[in-house]
């Protein structure tokens, strides 16, 4: 298990100014380092991703953007906004101060809705998806429901759970899934193995 720190408010993306290349560090440096220095299954079949809140948002985007690298995703209360809507509503002056800068193509490359649409066939084939959020998590539930609908419309199979009266609370989220937390990924790893190895 690897628990990387993505910094504050990076959402696990590369900043437009190059100061915070978080996604590149994770994808191009961290994963190869782990696979080179530890006994791993150095492929999608041996790799899962998950996170809570900003970590859930980042995990979701990375899994949808790089479906060849992960066999499962568990997003817990990760806000899933439509980035292109934010870009289109902003003024040029506002865009210049934002993490992703003022180029629409950069935002499109990091918009989870756009990359899910683009990679839908590979996602359907490769990535097992589980999403959970509390019904009292007002700041995140609406976008998570929106993404759930997006996956449904694209025909991407996934497990979607709303936990009654749960707010944005990592400890309570962990308690809710305590008995099955790792079972989900273990099952995903088993399902991802080639048939001859099962």
Placement of each model-derived feature along the sequence:
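Non-catalytic cap/lid and distal C-terminal segments of serine-dependent acyl enzymes
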Residues: 1-198
């Amino acid at each position: 298990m690897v628990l990387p720190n993505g910094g504050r408010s990076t959402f696990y993306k590369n900043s437009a100014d190059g100061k915070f290349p978080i996604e590149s560090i994770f994808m191009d440096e961290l994963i190869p380092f782990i696979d080179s220095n530890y006994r791993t299954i150095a492929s999608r079949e041996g790799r899962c991703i998950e996170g809570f809140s900003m970590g859930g948002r980042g995990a979701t985007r990375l899994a949808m953007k790089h479906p060849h690298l992960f066999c499962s995703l568990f997003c817990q209360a990760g806000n899933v906004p439509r980035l292109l809507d934010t870009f289109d509503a902003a003024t040029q002056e506002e865009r210049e101060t934002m993490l992703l800068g003022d180029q629409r193509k950069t935002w499109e490359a990091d918009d989870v809705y756009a990359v899910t649409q683009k990679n839908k066939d590979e996602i359907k084939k490769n990535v097992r998806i589980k999403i959970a959020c509390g019904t009292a998590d007002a700041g995140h539930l609406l976008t998570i429901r929106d993404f759930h609908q997006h996956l449904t419309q694209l025909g991407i199979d996934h497990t979607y759970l709303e936990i009654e009266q749960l707010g944005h609370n990592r400890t309570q989220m962990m308690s809710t899934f305590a008995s099955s937390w790792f079972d989900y990924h273990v099952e995903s790893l088993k399902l991802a193995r080639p048939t001859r190895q099962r």
